[in-house]
């Protein structure tokens, strides 16, 4: 499939501003209004010209901070900000970049707890293609983690490498159907109905395939997690393109 023909979604974690303020920034960019959705994730959203919702949600994994002069200090959970895009097309990458620039100007920054998750439409991937993707990732994972400088905390908990027992069984049984592959992924149980099934916390997340129809890549840091904590719009474009290849 041509890279420009693929749908994607992106989730970008950050702090430094509140969810309410982040939603205002997004609404200002689109020329629409901020809306409060509430719920478990205390979410806000703003619609674009196509009436697609760009959500701002709370995420429990984010260490919340705000600026106090030149210092960064602890902040309450209002500063837990995860930007969740609607289903996007290749042309929307520029929109994602502009939103990140606007949020950064408004005070958003990142720290080592913040990551980026990118979803690619799984519809074109049958079981053999998914197996091939798993093997490619397994062969390149160490290099990818080094290149992306994946934080050790995220690697150990939220962005684990491919499980060796899963990989061995996958290549031994060589599934030809999604159902067979699902059985291997969940080791005989069907966890696809659980949103927070533990198997989702891998760099290459196939739980997302069975739960929502997307392949999720979770290896990316939100930006420069050093003292500046900058969010890089250019890197985000490169990450999206990497997942589409």
Where are the regions a protein language model picked out?
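C-terminal accessory/tail domains of diverse enzymes
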Residues: 1-109, 123-245
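Short, conserved phosphate-binding/catalytic loop or strand-edge motifs used
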Residues: 112-116, 120
